[in-house]
Curated annotation (Swiss-Prot):
GO terms for molecular function: structural constituent of ribosome. The keyword Ribonucleoprotein applies. SUPFAM superfamilies: Ribosomal protein S16 (SSF54565). GO terms for cellular component: cytoplasm; small ribosomal subunit. It comes from Chromobacterium violaceum (strain ATCC 12472 / DSM 30191 / JCM 1249 / CCUG 213 / NBRC 12614 / NCIMB 9131 / NCTC 9757 / MK). One of its GO terms (biological process) is translation. This is Small ribosomal subunit protein bS16. Belongs to the bacterial ribosomal protein bS16 family.
Length: 83
């Protein structure tokens, strides 16, 4: 099954997450099909906190990819509706 989920990056105590499309059997930070955005939980007011590539996100949801709970929550917070 193809899922859209967060893959952790960054440094110790400075998390940064890529929003990736991957097979559900792959490791959290392992191989992925496509990067469709990012989430920076420690962003200050000058930095962008969340960014989605909406056309690619809608494509993957349209072909059957499932959103993880955390990605669905981020989309809801941004008041964005995935197709």
């Amino acid at each position: 099954m193809v899922v859209i989920r967060l893959a952790r990056g960054g440094a110790k105590n400075r998390p940064f997450y890529n929003i990736v499309v991957t097979d559900s059997r792959n490791r959290r930070d392992g191989r992925f099909i496509e990067r469709v955005g990012f989430y920076n939980p420690v962003a200050n007011e000058k930095q962008e906190r969340v960014r989605f590539t909406m056309d690619r996100l809608n494509y993957w949801v349209g072909v059957g990819a499932q959103l993880s709970d955390s990605v669905a929550k981020l989309l809801k917070e941004q008041k964005v509706v995935a197709a």
